């Protein structure tokens, strides 16, 4: 064990920070004349103490000193060149006691010193963070030590004020889980920044996953200003609000009343009211009604969204030095009567909703006569879990998902035009994909009862 390892107490029930005090005896090279410090450091690197967060140059007796390697007991333990420099510079070796306390060690090091020995190989010191709240997923064997783990995480991360764990892994229909407060304040109202937007929500009542921020931005990057997007399982707006900031027209839906409430609040916080309409419907109902909801919005605005922006405008072009003033300008965006994209970020079950797109425009066949008409791109997130004894290739997993989609929409998609993107590995046997494909005309305009 290193001299710089924390003390060990595997019987600790409540965190005792005072237990983590340690004195490390060292030798210091004291410089009566500190002008030689730089030369010594340059020439004697191998004999200097380099430990993360420990400053090897210290103040001592009205001058400076350099801490030497922790295994140095006398001058004879130093390299010959270092011994020469000590004599040349008139350096004096003096004993020095390095005092370490709880603040010195990282959370993982602290936890490895207090958890049972059979649990130290995979210490749960990592977490996802939303605002001031840290969310950890403790495996069953670590749950008895949850309070200890939570307190250490709280102590070691200044931006964290609340630490929670899932009570179980079974989500309700709103994708939320019962939470246990492990440490800190029982405050679940968080404020989170993502994609240049601000989000406010109750972490205990809505779905939010900070690990998906890259995926949010990837999908948003596919939208163009003036596109219409249907966000079927929109949550508090991680897709919808950043998209609407770039003048994308979004109809955002979520079944959870709490998500709907915070979606409305986040729309106001980010001042994107002109470009987004929130809905609190079941996903199937939202898809069925999507064309009608868009048409209602189109008609209520006479087909135009007006947005007031402030621009610098030149008010005198005749003078050598131009004079500008800030003026409100009305920027207009045409509202199409059709969708360019649908986002379905509900990986547990989104695939099962795809059959609702059959006949999406079946009652409005004249829509395809619009010279600007485009069929929507569906972006559906899904898991494709496999057994521990399997070793499927990415192509095999893609085929499994592809076959499910074709069966659900009752149409053989051209697989070459289907995009598969692996979002992340939730577990070693549970990849999360986003599959993007254009809804075929035969499906979109199919006549249904």
Curated annotation (Swiss-Prot):
The enzyme's main class, written as a single word, is: transferase
Could you say which EC number(s) this protein's record lists?
Answer: 2.1.1.228
Highest taxon of the lineage: Eukaryota
Q: Which InterPro entries match?
A: MeTrfase_TRM5/TYW2, SAM-dependent_MTases_sf, TRM5-TYW2-like_MTfase, TRM5/TYW2-like_N, tRNA_Gua_MeTrfase_euk
Residues bound to S-adenosyl-L-methionine: 216, 254-255, 282-283, 345
Q: A single GO molecular function, which one? A: tRNA (guanine(37)-N1)-methyltransferase activity
According to UniProt, the reaction catalysed is: guanosine(37) in tRNA + S-adenosyl-L-methionine = N(1)-methylguanosine(37) in tRNA + S-adenosyl-L-homocysteine + H(+)
Q: Which Gene Ontology terms of cellular component type are present?
A: mitochondrial matrix; nucleus
Set out the biological process GO terms recorded for this chain's protein: mitochondrial tRNA methylation; tRNA N1-guanine methylation
Keywords assigned by UniProt? Cytoplasm, Methyltransferase, Mitochondrion, Nucleus, S-adenosyl-L-methionine, Transferase, tRNA processing
User: What job does the chain carry out?
Assistant: Specifically methylates the N1 position of guanosine-37 in various cytoplasmic and mitochondrial tRNAs. Methylation is not dependent on the nature of the nucleoside 5' of the target nucleoside. This is the first step in the biosynthesis of wybutosine (yW), a modified base adjacent to the anticodon of tRNAs and required for accurate decoding.
Could you tell me what this protein is called? tRNA (guanine(37)-N(1))-methyltransferase
Q: Quote the gene name from the UniProt entry.
A: TRM5
